[in-house]
Swiss-Prot record:
<feature type="compositionally biased region" description="Basic and acidic residues">
    <location>
        <begin position="750"/>
        <end position="772"/>
    </location>
</feature>
<feature type="region of interest" description="Disordered">
    <location>
        <begin position="172"/>
        <end position="251"/>
    </location>
</feature>
<feature type="compositionally biased region" description="Basic residues">
    <location>
        <begin position="919"/>
        <end position="928"/>
    </location>
</feature>
<keyword id="KW-1017">Isopeptide bond</keyword>
<feature type="modified residue" description="Phosphoserine">
    <location>
        <position position="491"/>
    </location>
</feature>
<keyword id="KW-0832">Ubl conjugation</keyword>
<feature type="cross-link" description="Glycyl lysine isopeptide (Lys-Gly) (interchain with G-Cter in SUMO2)">
    <location>
        <position position="577"/>
    </location>
</feature>
<feature type="modified residue" description="N6-acetyllysine">
    <location>
        <position position="479"/>
    </location>
</feature>
<dbReference type="InterPro" id="IPR000467">
    <property type="entry name" value="G_patch_dom"/>
</dbReference>
<feature type="compositionally biased region" description="Basic residues">
    <location>
        <begin position="852"/>
        <end position="867"/>
    </location>
</feature>
<feature type="modified residue" description="Phosphoserine">
    <location>
        <position position="914"/>
    </location>
</feature>
<dbReference type="GO" id="GO:0030097">
    <property type="term" value="P:hemopoiesis"/>
</dbReference>
<feature type="compositionally biased region" description="Basic residues">
    <location>
        <begin position="799"/>
        <end position="809"/>
    </location>
</feature>
<feature type="modified residue" description="Phosphoserine">
    <location>
        <position position="1009"/>
    </location>
</feature>
<keyword id="KW-0175">Coiled coil</keyword>
<feature type="compositionally biased region" description="Basic residues">
    <location>
        <begin position="671"/>
        <end position="692"/>
    </location>
</feature>
<protein>
    <recommendedName>
        <fullName>G patch domain-containing protein 8</fullName>
    </recommendedName>
</protein>
Length: 1502
């Protein structure tokens, strides 16, 4: 510090500047001090001057001091020398040596206490005073008084009283204001609610069934639209092409109903006038489809507003592709005739349209405005030159409270067939409607007309859509519709010609749209015959198409149109499942009869005269095509399917019969616009080819021009043709149902075509469903007369199932349309096409496509329809060239799936063109190879698009289904959850699978879920797919046994297509099983199915003796199977249906569908389709049961996969191959338990490479399952027993994913987070519990609960287990894996923990949360369903699925259902690619089945 204070140093030298030196580093300060000299006014300056200093002089004595300013130096804070030390000393002294204060010195304990007491006393006194004073405080006046007197005076004073009054007044005022405000709000809310309710009521009333009172009574009918709307929705979205099938609102509504429905008769002037009491909300518009003028696509969306927007299924959109119709000249003419009528009614419609202005706006999605649609319709009507009856249209306007306003109002456009007997009596409208129905949808219209009477208009309008959505298969398949529409068969006969004329086209088109939405609301639909809704309830196929809902008659709308679809709207979404379940069960028995009679009515109607038959076939086929298609697009898609299929089928029939079938076909095509657009042409072409005489030229024309379209159409037509082909087939076997068996294949085919044309609506609806669910084949056979009749039980059941699974199956049905149709045609074509395919092929083989379209007459009719759907898919995705082609070719494949089955499945699924070019070969080879390949293709494509054309073809077929689904899916890929989901999945698969595997898988799923083709394709396709990949050479065997058995339909087709490599008898057998299952007509099914199934069984018996017993069991269980499992699409897993079959499945289906429409639906669809196939195959002999199982199996496919192991285990005890069959059969017969069979064969088929698979398939009837299993993964094949359960769903998903390679893509895309899985499982559990309750009651009533339940659980368990195996281990999300494990373990623990050869796997499964499965009481059911002990199941084959015994235990009620739903979704999406991996892929899952080898049996072995 010395230097710092140097200036103060005495020693310092003052002489120089050294003392003033600036410190370094302060240049700025230094500069500043130098720049600024001291100022003269500075006090220092002045002092210096006083001393004699002058400016400029130096300082100091010698004046040598500094002259410049004194430097500024930074001074540090220094107290001075020693100051700091001193301060520190003070601080230390103060702190460390503190002195004691005086007070402290004096303070003692006593003093402290004294102070404390004093303070306390003071405080107490203060408190007391305060309390005292508080008594004299006026709060109101805020015044403190010290004395009591003062306070009293104040209280009594006016001042205080006045303040009190003011205060009270203010409080009262405030309360009043608040209450008045709240009251006003309440009133406003009430008013709004009232308005909403009023609007809803008006809308509901506008859709009241003719004789049933308001269609939607808030309490009576709030049932989901059965996926009809959903299908339509899907159709709308999937059939983006537009729906010429926009329906006039109330024209079809029965006026006698008066108020509820806005029946706008689209007569010249009557329009709304015709519906005097009906709300003027109906917009009826004719959609004209001039041949010359390709009409714009008209989009019609049917959306039933419901308080719960949850039911997307309520939304349906229908698109009619006018271009397709344009392609089908005949179709156009009927359409135009219809259009004439429609236009005649257009004024009314327009008035109605004004009422439904928004709807109208919405309506012309693609096709301009309602007016244009109406004018088109009028033109179509004029072109159709429909007889006296003008088409009537129903237009459903969604209630105001509808959250989801459809792009298009629910327009139920139904072209009435000839006035149905009932309809004629009921309405003057009937005549116009008859006219309307007459032209486009002879059969559908007839059905509706006959069965609907007053409801005819409603029914007709809704017939197709309703049939489509409500009862997809009108004739055989439409459970409710089939019953009602089939009822309309009598009238159908009378209406036949008209129906053919107008109904087909317009009804197809309109009906699909309008009918779907309105028909569902209208009446359940008295399709059974002329009978109207005589009872309070009518069985209606739910969206899943597997369950028959007991639909309130008042909600039914019956259409005259081919699928005399009674589409019932359930805006409030009341659940009629119970009745539906009952219906499914009763109708399992009843429907075979009803549908059988209905089918017979149809068939008889058709049989009596070719026109009738044509109409019948067209109707049935239409129902199938449109219905089945509608099945695919339950709401929109179904509508589309109906339209397209119906026009396609109807056209094919009419082309043959009337040459108007083409318009019908077109209509139908128009119906399923997007999907059907291509399909329509394809179908048109197909039908044309089928009806070469009438349509060869057109076929060539349409075929070349619209090959992809035609492929779709072909699919469609295939569906249609399938019905006719099956009809031919039916006649060939002379099924009882084939009233007018045309031994001459041409004639039969003409009839079939006619039937197909008519039937496509019915069979499309019914057949499709039936085929998809068992009704499809029924429809095919219904179209084929006998099978069509046989299918009724199945059809109805399937229709119910499909309706239930409409969402699923409608989703599927989009695919279901194709699938159903394809399945129908496959089943029938396999069966009949195998039998007739060659002949049919030869007859129709004027062109490969002719064969493809024609030869598949039935098969192609079905498949054409399917392919049409596919082609629609294909064409819809034409942009996706690969898929377009694959899909086209897949369509071809799809149709060829049938075609190959039918055309001799010689053709391998190697090339797109091969599908067509090798149609014959395919038919031959398809028996095992095409069916196998085709299926494999379908599966393959579905499963792994990359799987070469083989798979692509199959996949494309799957996609075609997807296409149908896509229709739906486009509209409601959410699977509108279930139906839409499937449909969309299908369409989605078609579109997206082209680009993505995921949709494809779903497509596959849906495809499988679809119908028999879905099951078959799913089953066979999966098997095929895996076969294609792994067992190409074994394909025939595998396909034959797996597909032949499992996919009886395909194998049937192949079997019938004796050219197939597989044993003809088995093929026949399979075909029969398939066909009979598909046909499900009691007689038809029994005779044809018995025949074919006998062959099949004989073939199979060698392979699987239990199969016969189980098939027999399945037969007894027809009531059970009657409960069609909703198609997979309805809700991914069909396990509930498998368990409760109907109730369980629907509930679960809804959950899965809603929850994961895509995945679940795919899985479910796949599984279900597969199971259907399996069921159908398995239940071939018991046609009804088979058909029922066709639907059930799809559900069971889902269920089956989960349940598969137990059945297989049970079977295993008997025989590895035979055992699967037995469980399958057992599950099949116990409709609720279809999954078991599927699973059996899911597990069993996979184990065998080809022979094992064959044996498994044959014996286990795991053909479908096996298909599912095999497709699950070529790798998975080694886990046949394991893969199927998981793989089935997986395959289902995989089918979609198959497009990419294995299901994994779809599977993978559909991944669930653990939370999702948990939620889903919980949801499913809840649904399951609910379903279980219902189902238990139902099962106790309808059929052996134990038998029904047992298979379901096994299916369920296998599913979750197989799923992981199927799905690539890596693909399936860990969550999925965990859930699968959870469910599998739960199922295993709950079901399989008990008597299981592999306790470890069960234990492993057990570790999976057991709650879901625990409730499932399978013990009694399993035993009844599965003859063998659980040990047997396990003993024979390492199918280590959840032990059958584990499944057997009674404690497990139906909880496995959620697993199936959950697992298929979770696991199914990624089954294919990771088939092998999947099995290995999830240690968790693996542990579940590791002990059992459930996961690895075939796959690992292989």
């Amino acid at each position: 510090m010395a230097d710092r204070f140097s200036r103060f140093n005495e020693d310092r030298d003052f002489q120089g500047n050294h003392f003033d030196q600036y410190e370094e580093g302060h240049l700025e300060i230094e500069q500043a001090s130098l720049d600024k000299p001291i100022e003269s006014d500075n006090i220092g300056h002045r002092l210096l001057q006083k001393h004699g200093w002058k400016l400029g002089q130096g300082l100091g004595k010698s004046l040598q001091g500094r002259t410049d300013p004194i430097p500024i130096v930074v001074k540090y804070d220094v107290m001075g020398m020693g100051r700091m030390e001193m301060e520190l000393d003070y601080a230390e002294d103060a702190t460390e040596r503190r002195r004691v204060l005086e007070v402290e010195k004096e303070d003692t304990e006593e003093l402290r206490q004294k102070y404390k007491d004093y303070v306390d006393k003071e405080k107490a006194i203060a408190k007391a005073l305060e309390d005292l004073r508080a008594n004299f405080y006026c709060e109101l006046c805020d015044k403190q008084y010290q004395k009591h007197q003062e306070f009293d005076n104040h209280i009594n004073s006016y001042d205080h009283a006045h303040k009190q009054r003011l205060k009270d007044l203010k409080q009262r005022e405030f309360a009043r204001n608040v209450s008045s405000r709240s009251r006003k709000d309440e009133k406003k809310q009430e008013k709004a609610l009232r308005r909403l309710h009023e609007l809803a009521e008006q809308r509901k009333q506008a859709e009241c069934a003719p004789g049933s009172g308001p269609m939607f009574k808030p309490t009576t009918v709030a049932v989901d639209e059965e996926g009809g709307e959903d299908d339509k929705d899907e159709s709308a979205t999937n059939s983006g092409t537009g729906a010429t099938a926009s329906c006039g609102l109330g024209s079809e509504f029965s006026t006698d109903k008066g108020g509820p429905f806005t029946a706008v008769q689209i007569t010249n002037t009557t329009g709304l006038a015709q519906a005097p009491g009906l709300a003027s909300q109906g917009i009826s518009f004719g959609i004209k489809n001039n041949l010359g003028t390709p009409l714009q696509k008209l989009g019609v969306s049917f959306s039933f507003a419901k308080k719960a927007p949850v039911k997307l299924e309520s939304i349906a959109s229908v698109f009619k592709d006018h271009a397709e119709e344009g392609t089908s000249e005949d179709g156009t003419k009927p359409d135009e005739k219809s259009s004439d009528q429609g236009l005649q009614k257009v004024g009314d419609s327009d008035g109605s349209s004004n009422l439904d202005g928004k709807k109208e706006d919405e309506d012309p999605q693609d096709g301009g405005s309602l007016a244009s649609t109406l004018s088109k319709l009028k033109r179509m009507k004029r072109e159709e030159g429909a007889g006296a009856t003008e088409p009537e249209y129903y237009h459903y306007i969604p209630p105001a409270h509808c959250k989801v306003k459809p792009n298009f109002p629910f327009l139920l456009f139904m072209r009435a067939s000839e006035q149905m007997d009932g309809d004629n009596t009921t309405h003057p409208k009937n005549a116009p409607e008859s006219k309307k129905g007459s032209s486009p949808k002879p059969k559908s219209c007839i059905k509706a007309a006959a069965s609907q009477g007053a409801e005819k208009t409603v029914s007709e309008v809704s017939e197709q859509p309703k049939e489509t959505s409500m009862t997809e298969p009108s004739e055989p398949g439409s459970k409710a519709e089939a019953k009602k529409a089939l009822g309309g068969d009598v009238s159908d006969q009378s209406l036949e010609s008209h129906s053919q004329k107008v109904s087909e086209t317009q009804m197809c088109e309109s009906n699909s749209s309008k009918e779907t939405s309105l028909a569902t609301p209208a009446g359940k639909e008295s399709q059974e015959g002329p009978k109207h809704p005589t009872g309070p309830f009518f069985p209606v196929l739910s969206k899943d198409e597997s369950t028959a809902l007991q639909w309130p008659s008042e909600l039914l709308i019956f259409t005259k149109a081919e699928p005399s679809i009674s589409y019932s709207c359930n805006p409030l979404y009341f659940d009629f499942k119970l009745s539906r379940n009952k219906d499914a069960r009763t109708k399992g028995t009843e429907k075979p009869k009803d549908i059988g009679s209905s089918s017979k009515d149809h068939l008889q109607g058709l049989d009596p005269g070719e026109p009738n038959k044509s109409k019948e076939v067209g109707g049935e086929k239409i129902v199938r095509s449109s219905g089945g298609r509608m099945d695919a697009p339950a709401s929109g898609s179904a509508c589309s399917g109906l339209n397209k299929q119906e026009p396609g089928g109807s056209h094919g029939s009419e082309t043959e019969d009337t040459g108007r079938s083409l318009p019908s076909k077109k209509e139908r095509s128009g119906k399923s616009h997007r999907h059907k657009k291509k399909k329509k042409h394809k179908k048109s072409s197909k039908h044309k080819r089928k009806h070469k005489a009438d349509t060869e030229e057109k076929s060539s024309k349409a075929e070349s021009g619209e090959k992809s379209k035609k492929r779709k159409k072909r699919k469609r037509k295939k569906n249609k043709s399938s019905a006719p082909a099956d009809s031919e087939r039916g006649p060939k076997p002379e099924p009882p149902g084939s009233g007018s068996p045309a031994p001459p294949r041409r004639r039969r085919r003409a009839q079939d075509d006619s039937q197909r044309r008519s039937l496509p609506a019915e069979e499309g609806s019914s057949g499709k469903k039936d085929e998809g669910g068992g009704g499809s084949s029924s429809q095919d056979h219904g179209g084929r007369k006998h099978k069509g009749e046989l299918p009724p039980s199945s059809c109805q059941r399937r229709a119910g199932t499909k309706r239930s699974s409409r969402s699923s199956h409608r989703s599927q049905p989009s695919s279901g349309d194709e699938d159903s149709d394809d399945a129908s045609s496959h089943r029938l074509h396999q069966k009949s096409p195998s039998q007739y395919s060659e002949e049919e092929e030869e007859e129709d083989s004027g062109s490969e496509h002719s064969r493809s379209r024609s030869r598949s007459g039935r098969r192609h009719s079905s498949h054409r329809s399917s392919r049409r759907s596919y082609s629609s898919s294909s064409d819809a995705s034409s942009d996706q060239s690969c898929y377009s082609r694959q899909r086209s070719y897949s369509d071809d494949s799809y149709s060829d799936y049938s075609d190959r089955s039918r055309r001799h499945s010689k053709r391998s699924h190697d090339s797109d063109d091969s599908d067509y070019a090798s149609s014959k070969h395919r038919s031959k080879r398809h028996k095992y190879s095409s069916s196998d390949d085709d299926y494999s293709l379908s599966c393959s494509q579905s499963r792994s698009r990359s799987r070469s054309h083989t798979r692509e073809r199959s996949r494309s077929r799957g996609r075609s289904r997807s296409s149908s689904c896509s229709r739906s899916r486009s509209k409601r890929r959410s699977r509108s959850t279930t139906a839409h989901s499937w449909q969309r999945s299908r369409s989605y698969s078609r579109d997206r699978s082209r680009s993505t595997r995921s949709p494809s898988q779903r497509s596959g799923s849906r495809k499988r879920s679809w119908g028999h083709e879905s099951p078959e394709e799913r089953h066979s396709g999966r098997r095929d797919f895996i076969r294609s990949k792994i067992y190409r050479s074994q394909s025939p065997h595998y396909f034959r046994s797996g597909r032949g058995e499992g996919p009886g339909k395909k194998d049937d087709g192949r079997g019938d297509d004796s050219k197939a490599t597989g044993p003809p008898s088995q093929n026949s057998n399979i075909g029969t099983g398939r066909g009979s299952e598909g046909d499900c007509s009691p007689e038809d099914k029994n005779s044809v199915t018995a025949k074919l199934l006998l062959e099949k069984i004989q073939s199979r018996k060698v392979e699987r003796k239990p199969s016969v017993s189980e098939e027999v069991q399945a037969t007894p269980n027809k009531a059970g199977p009657k409960l069609k499992d909703p198609p997979q699409g309805y809700f991914g897993p069909k396990l509930p249906p498998s368990l409760g079959n109907k109730p369980v499945l629907p509930l679960i289906g809804k959950l899965p569908a809603t929850r994961k429409p895509n995945k679940k639906c795919e899985e479910s669809g796949l599984e279900r389709g597969e199971e259907q196939e399996q069921s159908e195959t398995e239940e071939g002999p018991p046609g009804s049961s088979d058909a029922l199982f066709g639907h059930q199996f799809p559900s069971e496919e889902t269920t089956g996969p989960l349940l598969d192991p137990p059945p297989e285990e049970s079977k295993s005890g008997e025989a590895t191959a035979d055992h699967p069959v037995a469980p399958l059969g057992t599950p099949a017969h116990s409709d609720c338990y279809p999954g078991d069979p599927t699973i059996s064969h899911n597990y069993l088929p996979d184990p065998s490479d080809g022979d094992t698979l064959e044996s498994l398939d044959s014996s286990s009837q795991p053909g479908p399952v096996e298909s599912s299993l095999l497709p699950i993964a070529p790798d998975l094949e080694h886990f046949p027993s394991y893969a199927p359960p998981s793989g089935d769903p997986s395959i289902e998903s995989t089918d979609g994913a198959e497009d990419a390679s294995l299901a994994p893509l779809e599977s993978q895309p559909i991944t669930f987070t653990p939370e999702e899985m948990e939620k889903y499982s919980k949801l499913q559990q809840a649904a399951q519990q609910h379903i279980q309750q219902q189902l238990l009651a139902k099962q106790v009533k309808a059929f052996p609960a134990s038998a029904a339940l047992a298979p379901a659980t096994p299916a369920l368990q296998p599913i979750h287990i197989q799923q992981p195996a199927t799905a690539s281990a890596t693909s399936i999300t860990t969550v999925q894996h965990a859930i699968l494990q959870h469910h599998a373990a739960a199922a295993a623990a709950a079901i399989g923990i008990h008597p299981h050869p592999h306790p470890q796997p069960l234990a492993q499964v057990h570790h999976i949360p057991q709650p879901h499965l625990t409730p499932i009481s399978l013990s009694h059911l399993t035993h009844s369903i599965i003859p063998g002990h659980p040990a047997t199941f396990l003993a024979s084959h390492p199918i280590h699925i959840i032990p059958a015994s584990a499944i057997h235990p009674g404690p497990f009620t139906f909880h496995p259902v959620p697993h199936a739903a959950l697992y298929p979704t979770l696991l199914a999406p990624r089954p294919a690619a990771a088939a092998a991996t999947a099995l290995h892929l999830h240690p968790l899952l693996h542990p579940i089945f590791s002990g059992q080898d459930l996961q690895h049996p075939p796959s690992h072995g292989t």
